[in-house]
Amino acid sequence: MADPRRDPAAESKDRPSTERVAAYTADAVRAAEAPLLAEGRPLMRTAARALADIAAAEVRTTPGAVLVLAGAGDNGGDALFAAADLASSAERVDVVLVRDRVHREALDAAVAAGARVVSVSDASAGVADYALVLDGILGIGRLADRRLRGSARALVERLLALAHRPRVLAVDVPSGLDPDDGTADAVILPADVTVTFGALKAGLVRGRGPELSGRVHLVDLGLEPYLRRAHPAVTAAIDVVRETPRAAETDRAQRA
């Protein structure tokens, strides 16, 4: 019997197709983003809307509460803005701040929308009860050492120890995966789905990337004209779902 919760049209859209895709280093992606950011393009909000839509589809299939692991950088900002969009459709959205520093605007948006901030200890105690985890701890920022540390590492170790883990959606790359070469520490949370923004990151198809990334969704942020100036780090055959972000409500109103 067909599952009444599943939309056949959406299911067809979300089915990955195998294609050869150019993958880029983190530096190349940042360079491609720079002109758009200089123009004032809201790339983070656009990425977060796409992330929230994909997370909402996951929750429709497997209903339950969502745990957002938010780091200090733009990756955490993406996750927190997505939490704001997701708060109206998920059963509950809990946010764990794994660093003292946080993207304040994104956190304020998430809390205003109904997400609640919980402690690492509370999240760890009830982690098996979540249906979905958004991994927004580390992204593609420049780091000399990408190993998870402190509360982030402890929480990931707790998740790894579960016999039945929640589904995991990685924000841009699984936290701790090197975005260029795909190397990773032993303590890393494998994703069921990775939502990557603007361009495929080389680390998703190199090293441990394929085993840790799950199904890859590639969100179009309009970087293609600028990526032509860069040489791909690698071109790989990969199962990928291409995503076009929905317009913000203000954008639609202006066009109308």
From Swiss-Prot:
Q: Report residues binding K(+).
A: 75, 135, 175
Uppermost EC category: isomerase
Q: Which reaction does it catalyse?
A: (6R)-NADHX = (6S)-NADHX; (6R)-NADPHX = (6S)-NADPHX
The EC number on file is 5.1.99.6
NADP as UniProt keyword: yes
Provide the disulphide bond pattern.
none
Keywords, in A-Z order: Isomerase, Metal-binding, NAD, NADP, Nucleotide-binding, Potassium
InterPro entries linked: YjeF_N_dom, YjeF_N_dom_sf
Indicate which residues the UniProt annotation says bind (6S)-NADPHX: 74-78, 139-147, 172
**Biased segments, Basic and acidic residues type:** 1-18
| Domain of life, per lineage | Bacteria
**Cofactor binding comment, as recorded:** Binds 1 potassium ion per subunit.
Which family is this protein grouped under?
Belongs to the NnrE/AIBP family.
Know the name of this protein?
NAD(P)H-hydrate epimerase
What gene is behind this protein?
nnrE
